[in-house]
From Swiss-Prot:
One of its GO terms (biological process) is lysine biosynthetic process via diaminopimelate. Pyruvate binds at residues 55, 214. The lineage of its organism: Bacteria, Bacillati, Cyanobacteriota, Cyanophyceae, Synechococcales. Belongs to the DapA family. GO terms for molecular function: 4-hydroxy-tetrahydrodipicolinate synthase activity. One of its GO terms (cellular component) is cytosol. This is 4-hydroxy-tetrahydrodipicolinate synthase. It is an enzyme of class 4 (lyase). InterPro entries: Aldolase_TIM (IPR013785), DapA (IPR005263), DapA-like (IPR002220), Schiff_base-form_aldolases_AS (IPR020625), Schiff_base-form_aldolases_CS (IPR020624). HAMAP family: DapA (MF_00418). The record marks 54, 117 as: Part of a proton relay during catalysis. Catalyzes the condensation of (S)-aspartate-beta-semialdehyde [(S)-ASA] and pyruvate to 4-hydroxy-tetrahydrodipicolinate (HTPA). The active site is at 144 (proton donor/acceptor), 172 (schiff-base intermediate with substrate). Pfam families: DHDPS (PF00701).
Length: 302
């Protein structure tokens, strides 16, 4: 008889929200609103928050703004949630310094994206992440693979080379396939906690060994995502499947164009004045905003 597969730990909980960065009318980062939004997300079921990730518009934030955001969110949620700082860069020295600063500022972890644009080979990726891990050994790291944005994919075998770094504890899988989860588990065993990086694939990924999700949609449907994951983990696959299917229209609407354009519009529709994205991103077009509003209204009726 086959023994049950070992399940991975959950270093950052089950639902981690990749937070938007609020801007005021002048385009400056709205730190007080970031703190209020962070508290709201925790109250809606988030175990953890990522600041200054993809959804947080890290490419158009200065390092100083990113550090200020981290400090504001850390202060707002206290010990009620894990706070991860986006510290990735396509320059190893920059990523090392940002990760050190995040650790000193009280982050519970760092989300470190695969270097973008310069397309390093696999040995370069291994050296890059090892340097970051060794620079802040006290800070747990979540490696982040999103080849659709970076133009470079980190192979499971490369991740396995880093399993001797005690603080390489988790991986955000955003390649768009469940096969990545299986390949990572086979290469790294259950030691590595894998998080879905795609809201629509959360349930399929959990079914093959992921532990949770780094979510965009949890800004507006956090309780439902929490309920879906909890139902599956408690053995009620039918309830989890029903929630998965119920949420698909929202997931589709939130990714109808480049993230975080739609989710910022969704928050605005819910009364959160988070501002529009910074250029070169643009506001959500009126037709997409109308579709998004209709989708959210329909979900509230279910």
């Amino acid at each position: 008889m086959t023994s049950p597969a070992a399940l991975s730990p959950t270093p950052f909980g089950r639902v981690v929200t990749a937070m938007v960065t609020p801007f005021d009318d002048s385009g400056a980062v709205d730190l007080p609103l970031a703190g209020r939004l962070a508290r709201h997300l925790v109250e809606q079921g988030s175990d953890g928050l990522v600041v200054s990730g993809t959804t947080g518009e890290s490419p158009t934030l200065s390092w100083q703004e990113q550090l200020q955001l981290l400090q504001a969110v850390r202060e707002a949620v206290g010990s009620d949630a894990q706070v991860l700082a986006g510290t990735g860069s396509n320059c190893t020295a920059e990523a090392v310094e940002a990760t050190r600063q995040a650790a000193a500022a009280g982050a519970d972890g760092a989300l470190v994206v695969v270097p973008y644009y310069n397309k390093p080979p696999q040995d370069g990726l291994a050296a890059h992440f090892r340097a970051i891990a060794e620079a802040a050994p006290e800070l747990p790291l979540m490696l982040y693979n999103i080849p659709g944005r970076t133009g470079c994919s980190m192979a499971p075998e490369t991740v396995a080379q880093l399993m001797d770094c005690p603080n390489v504890v988790s991986f955000k899988a955003a390649s768009g396939t469940t096969e990545e989860v299986t390949a990572l588990r086979l290469a790294c065993s259950s030691k590595l906690a894998i998080y879905s990086g795609d809201d629509g694939l959360t349930l399929p990924m959990i079914s093959v060994g992921a532990v949770g999700v780094v979510s965009v949609a949890s800004h507006v449907v956090g309780p439902q995502i929490r309920a879906m994951i909890d139902a599956y983990m408690q053995g009620d696959a039918a309830v989890a499947l029903a929630l998965h299917e119920q949420l698909q229209p929202v997931f589709k609407a939130l990714f109808a164009t480049t993230n975080p354009i739609p989710v910022k519009a969704a928050l605005q529709l819910n009364g959160w004045s988070v501002g529009d994205p910074r250029p070169p991103l643009s506001p959500l077009p009126d037709d997409m905003r109308s579709t998004l509003a209709q989708t959210m209204a329909a979900l509230r009726q279910t």
